[in-house]
């Protein structure tokens, strides 16, 4: 008979995996599952292998099982041999043949182990008892087949006799009176033996009895009738069924009596209202067992349906005949009423009420329609405003900061979005239309350009471009690099070879762009912008100002942050890069290290198998400069740069400033066309006729062709660096467009002004010590003003906000002082001075004017001023760990702890924390610190001390005390 792996594991005391592996080795495929059943043959193999610790009878039984299973085809012969033995003991059949097994099998199974413990000689007189008839054979049943093989001991023979008797009895009970039916007996007998072996297993596993029945039905095909006959007595019991029917009738008859006239029920219900309710109808019935079972089931059903905690009403509800109607009484779930339905209902009700009172219905209807129309118009207006709030009305060039204000988002988010699309922008950098569209769309806004007509007017004025007129133009090269890496030295070296000796230096330092003629007759325009900001701004607008970038790195230094930033700007703009490794004449120069650092940034130079050209140079000694210029020209040839010199000039503003003697001066770079004296130029919001032009050597020139930088006089203001300039036909047209742009810029300025909202006030309150620093920036050139404003705005923190309320080119005027006094601002002048009247007004109004020549000094001073406005930061430093080793209770003092300093040094003035099991129990101050009987200022590690804690006495042995100091640190930005 199959047996589960879990049972085999328990019997043999080995793991399931071991059993499965062993069976696999012996050619059996068994699933690794505790509930997998194995055959007797497999079980016998396992017993043979692992059953050394098993009792001898179990091992023999397993072997016998295997023997039995092998000749399973010859069942009849084995059965014939065994049926001969029991016939000697027929006298006992008469006593036990009439036994009917009761329905309560659980009791029998529970009593089995007890029966087996008793001496088996005493069981003969107690054969009549129902449970023990089955139990007595159960234990020795397994030995019946075993003993013929080894009949050695006397006590075992007695057991054999009993076993045989019971086997015969069972055969007889199955057959009832079959004298001739020997084949049935033969076939039943092996099954009975299987039954008994299974019963033996029941010593440990009670549930096997259920499996027993199911397996008997499955295994024996011929004996199903016999098995059904044997099991039938348990189910039939006609007398019990008849009695139950009678009791049901009696109970139903007595039911109404219990509610109305029953004297028993009312007496019992007050005594125990909940428990005796089911027992009340129990009196009329004589047999209580069957009745109790039925009522128990009913009681459970009542308890499930009824809510707990009710007292007397329960029996009445329980006894009602119409209990089935309860679910029908459930109320239907009401549908939720929407706000619109409510409003509609109210309107209809009001309309009915007003109609009753108003006899003149026409007038009321007219007024009602008028009201409805007004409400409808209001709704439409609100919807229109909501739509318009998502539309940004702006000019083509808007700074990142203004765009952020219009969309009511942080400027860092706008810059982050630009970086994600490959654009490096700064706070005050102006964005082109395409970039604005992408950024606005990212934040869910639509754009509407109010300056479209202005752009169209300029575009309409442009001339047609013929490809036949195109000629090669010199490349525009920007030199970029970290401070002190030799950028200026390289430019001076390149320029000194081509500049007349008497004209070196001078104004060329301010122009920032110049044209160099090489020995081979070719020209290169070098651009020396004040910072990489302007370069990026020009690239962002798509104006191809720079064609090639030279990145200078010092060989005795590293690739510095500003160098990395410059490389990123050039890469984002898609400009070819040539690396110049400078200062190779120095003793500590290591060009290979620079190449390695560039390779780590994924910029492989040609020496290392990459695509970027590099040249080792010494700018001071002129080593390698010619080779560098050759490589630059090679890159230019690959780009195939061309322009049309026959059309009107278009270009970019490099720098602008206010010169006291000459007025507003602008350095421009012509990209296409030719600029001539007397041309009408429009640049941003400024326009004017060119009065004079100077080249980088401060010599007057009459015209400037493509890729030529010149300094022009004649504009009515200082245009912003990076603005595009156009040459127009008439001055009137230029003035109209400039005025229109100025108007749009003012409107944009008003739109971007942000009033203080409740959210801002709440945020400031949350920060606590919020400060504002208003600044007015004046400088000599527009590039410096932009760079300084940008740097100051970047200093803003959560606690201090820097606002640049005004910035301009030129000296500090009286109007600047008035504005500063009104807005409580400070004036920062960069390489400019205040006028005499402005200085007097500033002293009178108490306005602070700070003047600087170096941009870094200005930034550092503003930074230190801001740091002075910050509240200091409190830093905590742990000074000692102390372990409590003893605790003393002292009256009027409290709990004193005897401690050992484990680490550091504890001072009398330290603040402390008491830590128990890693959790801070208390934080406070020391009440006293003593060493022996003397007060101590401090105790170092390894010494013991006594201490008590102010207002805390719950100190325990084993607690850790952590001593710490708080120091105020000046906050930095």
Curated annotation (Swiss-Prot):
Residues 582-585 are annotated as: G4. Residues 618-620 are annotated as: G5. Residues 97-135, 156-175, 183-204, 212-224, 237-250, 315-326, 333-343 have a biased composition (Basic and acidic residues). Residues 136-155, 252-266 have a biased composition (Low complexity). It holds the Pfam family GTP_EFTU_D2. It comes from the Bacteria. PROSITE patterns: G_TR_2, IF2. Gene3D superfamilies: P-loop containing nucleotide triphosphate hydrolases, Translation factors, Translation initiation factor IF- 2, domain 3. Residues 506-510 are annotated as: G2. Residues 97-343, 353-372 are annotated as: Disordered. PANTHER family: TR-TYPE G DOMAIN-CONTAINING PROTEIN, TRANSLATION INITIATION FACTOR IF-2-RELATED. One of the essential components for the initiation of protein synthesis. Protects formylmethionyl-tRNA from spontaneous hydrolysis and promotes its binding to the 30S ribosomal subunits. Also involved in the hydrolysis of GTP during the formation of the 70S ribosomal complex. This is Translation initiation factor IF-2. It comes from Parabacteroides distasonis (strain ATCC 8503 / DSM 20701 / CIP 104284 / JCM 5825 / NCTC 11152).
């Amino acid at each position: 008979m199959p047996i589960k792996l879990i049972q085999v594991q328990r019997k043999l005391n080995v793991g399931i995996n071991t059993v499965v592996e062993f069976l696999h080795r012996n050619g059996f495929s068994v699933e690794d599952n505790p509930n997998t059943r194995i055959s007797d043959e497999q079980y016998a193999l396992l017993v043979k292998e692992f059953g050394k610790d098993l009792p001898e009878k179990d091992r023999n039984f397993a072997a016998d099982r295997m023997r039995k299973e092998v000749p399973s085809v010859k069942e009849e012969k084995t059965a014939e041999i065994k049926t001969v033995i029991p016939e000697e003991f027929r006298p006992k059949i008469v006593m036990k043949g009439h036994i009917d097994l009761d329905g309560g099998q659980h009791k029998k199974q529970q009593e089995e182990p007890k029966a087996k413990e008793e001496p088996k000689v005493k069981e003969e007189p107690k054969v009549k008892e129902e449970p023990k008839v089955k139990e007595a054979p159960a234990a020795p049943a397994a030995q019946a087949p075993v003993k013929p093989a080894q009949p050695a001991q006397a006590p075992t023979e007695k057991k054999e006799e009993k076993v045989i008797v019971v086997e015969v009895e069972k055969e007889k009970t199955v057959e009832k009176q079959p004298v001739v039916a020997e084949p049935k007996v033969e076939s039943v007998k092996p099954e009975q033996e299987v039954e008994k072996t299974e019963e033996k297993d029941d010593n440990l596993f009670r549930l096997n009895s259920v499996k027993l029945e199911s397996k008997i039905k499955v295994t024996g095909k011929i004996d199903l009738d016999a098995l059904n006959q044997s099991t039938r007595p348990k189910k039939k019991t006609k007398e019990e069924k008849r009695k139950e029917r009678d009791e049901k009738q009696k109970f139903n008859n007595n039911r109404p009596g219990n509610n109305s006239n029953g004297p028993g029920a009312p007496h019992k219900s007050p005594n125990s209202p909940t428990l005796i309710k089911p027992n009340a109808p129990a009196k009329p019935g004589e047999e209580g067992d069957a009745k109790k079972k039925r009522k128990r089931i009913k009681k459970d059903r009542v308890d499930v349906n009824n809510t707990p905690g009710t007292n007397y009403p329960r029996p009445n509800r329980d006894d009602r005949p119409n209990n089935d109607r309860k679910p029908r009484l459930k109320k239907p779930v009401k549908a939720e009423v929407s706000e619109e339905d409510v409003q509609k209902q109210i309107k209809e009700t009001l309309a009915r009420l007003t109609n009753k009172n108003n006899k003149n219905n026409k007038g009321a209807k007219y007024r009602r329609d008028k009201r409805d129309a007004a409400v409808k118009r209001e709704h439409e207006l609100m919807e229109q405003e909501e739509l318009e709030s998502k539309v940004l009305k702006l000019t083509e060039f808007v700074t990142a900061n203004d765009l952020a204000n219009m969309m009511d988002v942080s400027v860092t988010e706008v810059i982050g979005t630009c970086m994600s699309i490959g654009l490096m922008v700064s706070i005050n950098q102006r964005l082109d239309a395409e970039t604005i569209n992408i950024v606005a769309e990212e934040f869910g806004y639509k754009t509407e350009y109010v300056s479209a007509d202005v752009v169209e007017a300029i575009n309409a004025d442009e001339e047609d471009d013929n490809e036949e007129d195109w000629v090669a133009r010199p490349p525009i090269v920007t030199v970029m690099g970290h401070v002190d890496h030799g950028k200026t030295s390289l430019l001076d070296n390149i320029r000194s070879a081509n500049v007349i000796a008497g004209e070196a230096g001078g104004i060329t330092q301010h122009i920032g762009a110049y044209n160099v003629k090489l020995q081979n007759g070719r020209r290169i325009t070098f651009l020396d912008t004040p910072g990489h900001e302007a370069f990026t701004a020009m690239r962002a607008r798509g104006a191809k100002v720079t064609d090639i970038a030279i990145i200078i790195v010092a060989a005795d230094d590293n690739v510095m942050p500003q160098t990395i930033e410059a490389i990123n700007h050039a890469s984002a703009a898609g400009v070819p890069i040539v690396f110049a490794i400078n200062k190779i004449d120095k003793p500590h120069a290591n060009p290979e290290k620079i190449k390695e650092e560039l390779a780590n940034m994924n910029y492989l130079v040609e020496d290392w198998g990459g695509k970027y050209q590099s040249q080792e140079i010494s700018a001071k000694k002129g080593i390698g400069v010619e080779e560098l210029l050759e490589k630059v020209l090679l890159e230019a040839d690959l780009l195939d740069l061309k322009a049309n010199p026959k059309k009107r000039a278009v270009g970019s503003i490099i720098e602008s400033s206010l010169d006291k003697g000459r007025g507003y001066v602008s350095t421009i770079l012509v990209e296409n066309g030719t600029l001539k004296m007397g041309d009408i130029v429009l640049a941003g919001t400024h326009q004017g006729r060119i009065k004079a032009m100077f080249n980088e050597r401060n010599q007057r020139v009459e015209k400037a062709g493509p890729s030529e930088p010149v300094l022009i006089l004649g504009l009515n203001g200082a245009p912003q660096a990076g603005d595009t300039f156009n040459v127009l036909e008439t001055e009137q047209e230029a003035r109209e467009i400039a005025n229109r742009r100025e108007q749009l810029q003012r409107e944009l300025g008003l739109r971007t002004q942000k009033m203080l909202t409740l959210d801002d006030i709440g945020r400031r309150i949350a920060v606590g010590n919020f400060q504002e620093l208003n600044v007015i920036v004046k400088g000599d050139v527009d590039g410096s003003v932009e760079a300084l404003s940008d740097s100051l705005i970047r200093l803003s923190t959560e606690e201090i906000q820097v606002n640049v309320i005004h910035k301009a080119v030129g000296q500090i005027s009286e109007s600047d002082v008035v504005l500063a006094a009104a807005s409580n601002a400070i004036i920062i002048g960069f390489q400019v001075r205040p006028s005499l009247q402005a200085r007097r007004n500033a002293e009178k109004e108490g306005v602070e004017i700070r003047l600087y020549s170096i941009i870094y000094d200005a930034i550092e001073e503003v930074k230190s001023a801001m740091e002075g406005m910050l509240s200091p930061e409190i830093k905590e430093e742990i000074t000692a760990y102390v372990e409590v080793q003893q605790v003393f209770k002292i009256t009027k003092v409290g709990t004193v702890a005897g401690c050992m300093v484990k680490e550091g040094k504890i001072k009398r003035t330290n603040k402390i924390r008491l830590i128990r099991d890693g959790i801070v129990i208390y934080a406070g101050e020391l009440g006293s610190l003593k060493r022996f009987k003397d007060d101590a200022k401090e105790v170092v590690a390894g010494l013991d001390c006594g201490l008590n804690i102010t207002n805390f006495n719950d100190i325990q042995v084993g607690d850790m005390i952590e001593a710490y100091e708080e120091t105020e640190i000046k906050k930095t930005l």
